[in-house]
């Protein structure tokens, strides 16, 4: 009995890794924040639960397909060489079945238990990431993460649509914030994984334009990010609590970017990459806290 259970557990763990759970968690978190910001009070619990489930399922399906498409590239990169698809321990048919099951279930949940708008927007995001970004943009242009970043920026709009049956300007402001955040986040990773990307033949910005050019653009995007994060306050979507948080977090982001530009090290690039994840989570948490503070005032 134990000998049979061990391989099954190992296979399930490999499936889970293909869905990139850490990345999925951040995306789903931003979607949930969008849900809570979409209404004056508390959103409908059913919409939150099933919206979260459906968005998570389709995100996981997209990441699994991404791993399948990039299996040969992943095999040449130290960071991704241990993925089951890169090692060939999971077949293409298994990955397609997994992605089809997750994606199909997600679409059914969103269509029948949330609303068709959220289903179609989430499906478009799936196509944008799994096909347009992975197949067309990533292997062809150093602007891959800039253009393709829209699909990764969509979660707040998906969450908003799940609760409000609409995607107003406020939701697109949140999308814009993540869209501007995405390039410096990924370029920091590409800097300290530069040799990996070069070995894999991917035209990431540090590979095609060099380290200093990339560091400059990280700094420029970090400044643009600080400006963009003031928009919720400017359009009266959020108040002073959010603005103070956004400026404090943005100041830390710019400080990291400035240090990286002045004096590069892999360790500092790694710290910026990790901080950028925390930054986005705290920024969206500040949006929610400010929203609730406004309701209680």
From Swiss-Prot:
Recorded name of the encoding gene: ctaB
Annotated function: Converts heme B (protoheme IX) to heme O by substitution of the vinyl group on carbon 2 of heme B porphyrin ring with a hydroxyethyl farnesyl side group.
Subcellular location: Cell inner membrane
Catalytic activity: heme b + (2E,6E)-farnesyl diphosphate + H2O = Fe(II)-heme o + diphosphate
Homology family: Belongs to the UbiA prenyltransferase family. Protoheme IX farnesyltransferase subfamily.
Membrane topology of the entry: Multi-pass membrane protein
Name of the protein in question: Protoheme IX farnesyltransferase
Keyword Transferase: yes
Transmembrane segments: 23-43, 49-69, 90-110, 117-137, 144-164, 171-191, 215-235, 238-258, 277-297
PROSITE patterns: UBIA
Manganese among keywords: no
Protein's pathway: Porphyrin-containing compound metabolism; heme O biosynthesis; heme O from protoheme: step 1/1
EC numbers on record: 2.5.1.141
Chief location category: membrane
GO biological process, one term: heme O biosynthetic process
A single GO cellular-component term on record: plasma membrane
More about this protein: Carbon 2 of the heme B porphyrin ring is defined according to the Fischer nomenclature.
Keywords: Cell inner membrane, Cell membrane, Heme biosynthesis, Membrane, Transferase, Transmembrane, Transmembrane helix
Domain of life per record: Bacteria
Gene3D superfamilies listed in its UniProt record: UbiA prenyltransferase
UniProt-recorded Gene Ontology molecular function terms: protoheme IX farnesyltransferase activity
